[in-house]
């Protein structure tokens, strides 16, 4: 069985092979059922140092559909366009490796670094959006929202940088 990274599995047999190539015959195509029933979008505030690499790795291993790096006012890390492009390329490589390691049916994308305002605009298209807040009182409403998430819904989760989000 071979996965294509886009959520499909193919049951194949090897028809022939050479030193650097194999010819396979597809016997069956089926949807990979290993993915979460909801698409989880992680809007991650840029953390200090190389912590984003570990965040991308673990998020992908846990089933996140897409990681969107967010440059916030309180973030210690400030990336210019050139640095941001290189970082995103590196994070995408980490996502590919983590997806393979975890046996994911898809390769989650790492989006371009965006501003908090751009992230909020993007999140408007999602079914459910959660922004954990360290000064929030009680968890009942959050638990209720999470309990009501249904298969097929898209869920955005915002996680701030070390300095938190701006009030």
Where would I find each of the regions flagged by the language model?
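N-terminal positively charged helical leader segments and presequences
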Residues: 1-31
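Short connector loops at helix/strand junctions that flank enzyme active sites
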Residues: 9, 19-21, 35-39, 152-154
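RNA substrate-binding interface of SAM-dependent RNA methyltransferases
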Residues: 27-131
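Glycine-rich nucleotide phosphate-binding loop and flanking beta-alpha elements
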Residues: 50, 138-140, 165
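Short amphipathic alpha-helix with an adjacent loop that forms part of the alpha/beta core around
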Residues: 119-124, 142-150
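A glycine-rich beta-strand to alpha-helix segment
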Residues: 149-167
């Amino acid at each position: 069985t071979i996965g294509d990274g886009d959520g499909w599995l193919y049951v194949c047999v090897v028809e022939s092979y050479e030193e650097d190539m194999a010819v396979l015959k597809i016997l069956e195509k089926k949807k990979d059922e290993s993915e979460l029933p909801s698409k989880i979008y992680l809007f991650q505030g840029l953390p200090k140092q190389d912590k984003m690499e570990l965040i991308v790795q673990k998020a992908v291993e846990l089933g996140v559909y897409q990681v969107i790096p967010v440059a916030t006012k309180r973030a210690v890390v400030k990336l210019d366009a050139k640095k941001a492009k290189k970082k995103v390329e590196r994070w995408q490589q980490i996502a590919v490796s983590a997806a393979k390691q975890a046996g994911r049916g898809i390769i989650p994308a790492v989006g371009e670094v965006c501003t908090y305002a751009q992230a909020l605009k993007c999140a408007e298209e999602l079914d459910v959006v959660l922004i954990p807040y360290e000064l929030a009182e009680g968890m009942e409403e959050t638990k209720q929202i999470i309990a009501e998430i249904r298969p097929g819904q898209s869920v955005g989760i915002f996680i701030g940088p070390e300095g938190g989000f701006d009030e």
